[in-house]
Each structure stands twice: as structure tokens, then as C-alpha cells.
């Protein structure tokens, strides 16, 4: 009964806040490697980077600092850790990850999830592998993969990896018979010194973020205005520049807000690793619409912000934005949620709901 009450309250509050169209948001930490910082503590969650999920699975999170991927369920605003922890091969410097819808057809050895790493390794996991992912592409000093996404075109599965060192989008074939894609994934107007930092397939369009390379072409250089976002089709043909400089600061996280997400419904959210802000753009014409702000109206900032993802409805609310981060210079980790600040009516709902939960708890004693 108590669990049902919590779930009902969370759903009603979420629905009320999503429809309110609020411009202000607040952050709730769900998981941290540091005790007392979030709902639960998980020492494996260090420099939490990429996030992925199937339509029904828990959240899979890349833990760059510990070389594993950890799994979390979020139901009714309450998070729990799944028993499975997957070790990533190579040096374990895992960054982005993807869910592979083509696994049932044998794409990528039937691996359900794929992972990119900074040592150039691409790895994959399926249930029969147990707690260790397999190597699909061996590591190489020529490659520094910061992100990866999935796409299907011409009846074949492909992976698209952001190679920060080489300055390319590297295409991974899901099967040996897949044809080579015709496009080059080149933005012809991109300034020298910038390289693909992340890539995300959103409704069949590939969005590529670019950050400024350091002298070793391994890490990004943060700074106001240092970033670009361009779009390509699944064959690698350049579609156009979506965003340039302005509020961008080493952009990495990408997510499309659902149609029910208030003022920014249907807009592209771009998370900046550099300053931790989240910018909003019209996904069709690139118009800058503003940035998420906190309860005081100041720009919302999450230290070491990496991934952005909405829930799938089975795990995590579809109207709720989840994030991963590597705060304190990537030495710690966070997995959390960003939600609209409730309007007065929603606060009354929450207050009444808290009273209901208190009554339920008393009756349960």
C-alpha cells in the first residue's frame, strides 16, 4: 500500500509539473559515489558518463572512473541498483554507450549494449557474457572515442563513434555484409582544432557536438562559446550547422524533450560539460531558445555534466530528464533527475500527498 501511494503521488506531481510549463528546474541526486549526497551510494559510480536504455530496461550508466557500467531502476522517484555490473575491456575508460535494437537479428554479435572508450576500444554486452563485455574493436592510440550511437539504414545496423583524436565519426558495421556508407561526416565550415565530442541519433538524424581539442587531442578545452552542433543523415551526408559558439561550452549531452515538456516541448536540449549548463534549441532551425534555470531564475549548472536522457516509462518517467555527471574534476559521480519547479497548485498536491504518506505509514505500523 505504501509503495502504491508513493508511486501515485509521484505520478500526479510529475504530471502537474510537466503541464505547468515552468521555466525553472531543480536537481535531485539519485546515486552518488559519496555517502550522504544522494538517495543511494554506489562506489562504482565515478565519472558517470553515457546513459542508455531499451524501451523497458533499467538505465545503463558508463562509469569512466571505475571501468564498469552500472544499472539503476527508477520507479515512482525511488532509485535502486540492479545487481548486474558489467566490466569494460581495454583500460576501462568507458564514455558513451548505446542500446542495440538490431541485436535480435545478430547485429554486433547480438550484443544488446555497446560501449565506446577513450583508449579506442569498442565493446559490447549480451546476457550470455555474464559480467564482462567483449571487445568488438581493439583499442588503438589513434582513436579516442568520446561517444557512440546506433542507426539503421538500408536494412543494416551501424554504430557511429565520435573519434575525438582523429576528428572523425567512425562507422562500425553491425554485420560483415553491411555496405560502406557514402557520406564523409564532415562539416565543411568547422573551424580547425574542433573535433566530434559526441554523436546522438534523434529521430533518424545524427546530431554531432564538437569541442576544442587540447594539444594531445585527448581532452577538450572548456570555455564560453567553445562548441558547435551539426547534423547529418544516417549515411554521413552533412545536413547543416545547428548551433555555433554562443552559449555552448564543450557540449556533450543531447536529448529531445517530449511533447508534454511544457515550454520547451519538442526542443533539443544540449548539455555543456564545460560549465554544466543545459541550452535549448529549436531542432529544426537551430534558434537558441534559452537555458534551463534553477528555482531562483539563475542558470542551472551541474558540475561535470555528461549524459541527458528521458525515462522510458517502464523505468523512469517519460516526462522527466535524467542526467549523469563527473563532478570535482571527474573524480566523483552523480546520476540524478532534473524536474520543473512545481507551480503553487503542484506544491499543494505534494503537501497533501506527504500527509497521505504519513497516514499510510502510521496505519502500517
Please annotate each region the language model reported.
Residues 10, 53, 349-352:
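Charged, amphipathic alpha-helical interaction segments
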Residues 7-15, 355:
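Bacterial N-terminal signal peptides
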Residues 343-360:
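A short, hydrophobic C-terminal helix/tail in secreted or cell-surface proteins
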Residues 1-6:
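Bacterial N-terminal signal peptides that target proteins for export
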Residues 21-340:
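Sequence/structural signature of beta-propeller domains
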Residues 18:
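An N-terminal RHG(E/S)-centered segment typical of histidine phosphatases
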